[in-house]
Amino acid sequence: MGKRLISQNRGRGTPKYRSPTHKRKGAVKYRSYDEMEKDGKILGTVVDILHDPGRSAPVAKVRFANDEERLVLIPEGIQVGEEIECGISAEIKPGNVLPLGEIPEGIPVYNIETIPGDGGKLVRSGGCYAHVISHDVGKTIVKLPSGFSKVLNPACRATVGVVAGGGRKEKPFVKAGKKYHSLSAKAVAWPKVRGVAMNAVDHPYGGGRHQHLGKPSSVSRHTSPGRKVGHIASRRTGRK
């Protein structure tokens, strides 16, 4: 009897495949959407900038005027000691948080809420930004980094600017050890071994005197879990 596939082991939920969230600094999201933000604004001061393992962008510890502290994603150009504003009457300046309906068209934004008050869900990676395209009655259209235009509630909050940490992909890893340590902070099983490079006991494509599949790559959607590799329930394969 063969061994279980990686996809089967992943479903068991062992520590190897779990995201090591215990290494994180904490939840990175907006403060609660209260009357101070809905009617005016609240000031906060950046007291520290931290590296968060497993996250591609640095985070800042912000202390607000009511002595509340939050971890937030910061834009390029922010430094310790600067003030940020959160609320409907905040200035259009990098780092400030406003509802989408109050942000002019063409302004880059990030950490966008999908539901007002959810803390920010979209565009959170280092160097990323979206653009406010247009406003209409009861909706705002935002162009995401993928090119997809998303319709959102104008009350959803976003931060003005570009997420810090851009250009991280321009520097190559060079060494496998650096790649290993980078991915050890995430729920990524690495290195990824090809099925044809394994032994027959480890994978349906393993074994043989040379590396080849040895069987059709298309499999039924209803086949057994240990055989479900390759093109699963594919309508067609190969070039078009």
Swiss-Prot record:
Ranges where the record places region Disordered: 1-28, 206-240
GO molecular function, one term: rRNA binding
Gene3D superfamilies linked to this entry: 2.30.30.30, Nucleic acid-binding proteins, Ribosomal protein L2, domain 3
Bias type Polar residues, positions: 1-11
One annotated GO biological process: cytoplasmic translation
Pfam families per record: Ribosomal_L2, Ribosomal_L2_C
Keyword terms of this UniProt record: Ribonucleoprotein, Ribosomal protein, RNA-binding, rRNA-binding
Basic residues composition-biased segments: 13-28, 224-240
One term under GO cellular component: cytosolic large ribosomal subunit
Cited InterPro entries: NA-bd_OB-fold (IPR012340), Rib_uL2_dom2 (IPR014722), Ribosomal_uL2 (IPR002171), Ribosomal_uL2_arc_euk (IPR023672), Ribosomal_uL2_C (IPR022669), Ribosomal_uL2_CS (IPR022671), Ribosomal_uL2_dom3 (IPR014726), Ribosomal_uL2_RNA-bd_dom (IPR022666)
Subunit structure: Part of the 50S ribosomal subunit. Forms a bridge to the 30S subunit in the 70S ribosome.
Function field: One of the primary rRNA binding proteins. Required for association of the 30S and 50S subunits to form the 70S ribosome, for tRNA binding and peptide bond formation. It has been suggested to have peptidyltransferase activity; this is somewhat controversial. Makes several contacts with the 16S rRNA in the 70S ribosome.
Family of this protein: Belongs to the universal ribosomal protein uL2 family.
Protein name: Large ribosomal subunit protein uL2
